[in-house]
Amino acid sequence: MTTTDPVQLTADLVRCPSVTPTEGGALVLLERLLTDAGFSCTRVDRGEVCNLFARWGDKAHARTFGFNGHTDVVPIGDEAAWTHDPFGAEIVEGVMYGRGTTDMKSGVAAFAAAAIDFVQDTPPDGAVVLTITGDEEGDAVDGTTALLDYMDAAGEKMSVCLVGEPTCPNHMGEMIKIGRRGSMTAWFTVTGVQGHSAYPHRANNPMNGLARLMDRLGSHQLDEGSEHFDASTLAIVTIDTGNPATNVIPAQGRAAVNIRFNDLHSGASLTDWLQGEADKVAKEFGLEVDMKVQISGESFITPPGDLSDLVSRAVQTETNQAPELSTTGGTSDARFVKSHCPVVEFGLVGKTMHQVDENVDVAHIHQLKSIYSRILKDYFS
């Protein structure tokens, strides 16, 4: 019986300094491991980003279980603030420390270990695919999207996909993500007429219009939530003039808002609403208001059904806890996968991700491998 140690693999990956978009040796390590286990591996590098596609079994099989994860990590920040080497994978009293221990080298290691053992011990009638990117924490332009583009061009398929992001807020097994809110940011530049603050009638203060616009946006209730989502939110994230002089009315003011939106909206519909509000303020104050928008991802939902039931049963069997089906939190690469096949997310407890002394309970890594192993077994049974 094959036994691939997910803790050792996690440690090996953590010791690869793969701060996005640097590959750092992590994908090289995975490619070698998976190739030795009989997987067909293809590097799908695009731009400055390295990605790995790995498949065991027949290409485009009708029953192909897919996994998506990333080996890139966020910067460590001030290394002096760390108690443990951020790339040392030190284990102290059953806890492993290091950047990526939670987000999400442990998830990648747990699934890789589960998949290797599963296909070698009980070869299924089907295929197992891993799509591992080095561009999830960065711009996410040449990562999972590049892998999906490659799959489309090569005729590769996933019937379903599990994303291994840390989904549990506090306790192992408590939450599965079946969807995500959309995310977009809008930047506003309001241009008026500069002047002396003692003679405001000779100027046109852009800050008056900018303040009105931010008040209109910030006080507006986008919705009250939907069946599977909480209410959409709009946060004012910056207001700036770049003006240090208190006796000068500035010529320009700038602000930005970030919107996390549910399935009652789209990036396009919200862009139209924002533009309409900007136009009203421009007309009211006689100002020029320019807007630039970036839509990071649309909201999506994989309705509760076969895939979420499959994962829920495995989680409950291994943890004795019935997981909540949730759409909370930020964006993930599931927003790209959802256009390819049904997708859900399940992984470890994410309390320390991106923090100094990021860490994971090593027992949870073993438990996650057991959950992933059961998911594979049940999917192909």
Swiss-Prot record:
Residues annotated as the enzyme's active site: 72, 136
Enzyme class at the top of the EC tree: hydrolase
Domain of life: Bacteria
Residue ranges of the TM segments: none
Keywords, ordered alphabetically: Amino-acid biosynthesis, Cobalt, Diaminopimelate biosynthesis, Hydrolase, Lysine biosynthesis, Metal-binding, Zinc
Binding locations of Zn(2+) 1: 70, 103, 165
Reaction it catalyzes: N-succinyl-(2S,6S)-2,6-diaminopimelate + H2O = (2S,6S)-2,6-diaminopimelate + succinate
Pathway info: Amino-acid biosynthesis; L-lysine biosynthesis via DAP pathway; LL-2,6-diaminopimelate from (S)-tetrahydrodipicolinate (succinylase route): step 3/3
Pfam (any one): M20_dimer
One Gene Ontology MF term: cobalt ion binding
GO biological process: diaminopimelate biosynthetic process; L-arginine biosynthetic process; lysine biosynthetic process via diaminopimelate
Enzyme Commission number(s) of this protein: 3.5.1.18
Annotated cofactor note: Binds 2 Zn(2+) or Co(2+) ions per subunit.
Binding-site list for Zn(2+) 2: 103, 137, 354
Entry's family note: Belongs to the peptidase M20A family. DapE subfamily.
NCBIfam families in the record: dapE_proteo, PRK13009.1
Function comment: Catalyzes the hydrolysis of N-succinyl-L,L-diaminopimelic acid (SDAP), forming succinate and LL-2,6-diaminopimelate (DAP), an intermediate involved in the bacterial biosynthesis of lysine and meso-diaminopimelic acid, an essential component of bacterial cell walls.
Subunit organization: Homodimer.
PANTHER family for this protein: ACETYLORNITHINE DEACETYLASE, N-ACETYL-L-CITRULLINE DEACETYLASE
Record-given protein name: Succinyl-diaminopimelate desuccinylase 1
The species this protein was found in: Ruegeria sp. (strain TM1040) (Silicibacter sp.)
